[in-house]
Amino acid sequence: MTAVRPPNPAGATAIVTGGGSGIGAALVRALVAAGAHVVVADLDLAAARRVAEEVTTTRSARAGAPAVAGSAEPARLDVTDAEAVSALVEQVISSRGGLDMMFANAGITWGGDTELLSLDQWNAIIDVNVRGVVHCVHAAYPHMIARGSGALVLTASMGGLCPAGLITSYAMTKHAVVGLGLSLRAEAADRGVGVTVVCPAAVDTAILDKGQLDGFDGRRFYLDGQGVRRPLDPDRLAASVLAGVAGNRALVVEPVRARATWRLQRLAPGLMDRMIARYVRTSRASTAR
């Protein structure tokens, strides 16, 4: 039996999928600031390059970002391609001598009534949000248990902990990620590998404005539905994630209001069910105007 000893980011090697924007880019910034070497993996190679360049300058282009301590390199990666994910992991292990942290973060969303989704859209969100995470785990986990150390960090959502009508396909995939992460965590505990699942409420990234069907306003839906004035800052979330990984926490749920919502879901699921149904009705009426 090997106790879990979370890797110290200083000197660690990490891969961040979806690292070219949003939460992924914030994770890259936090990891490099902490001294890690980060492979910024993204389907959009130009975005990955931009993030890698920004975080490895004397001071990040983002105002108020911490001074640089680590390094970064870009890589083009389609997480739906299992062979490509495995090849990247093997390449990193070969060139860096190992992989300490794998952040399976890439994701997409659709918002609107479920009957509007085409089968291609269903398959796309499953391929990226579920299979993409599975491909990361399949490639990195065996290496980590062979070494007896490492951390898998899976980006889910509050939509993976609570029902979320009108983003049903997204919530389904994020429930799958939560189930994968918490179940694998039980297996990995005696093998020295930590597994942490990240479940934020609305984060201030471009995904809030993507995947909209038939007039669905994703940004308003998330903010009004969660009763907040502004979405969570991705850099604040990234700091919480690294703290959660360092503490070998099973779940990172942010912000505080999201943790309260999660508790309500567990304590009063019937009440939550009625609240969500009422909010779906309100959102539909607002979209119809």
Where are these regions (language model features)?
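Active-site helix of classical SDR
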Residues: 137, 173
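The beta1-alpha1 cofactor-binding region of Rossmann-like NAD(H)/NADP(H)-dependent oxidoreductases
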Residues: 45-46, 76-87, 119
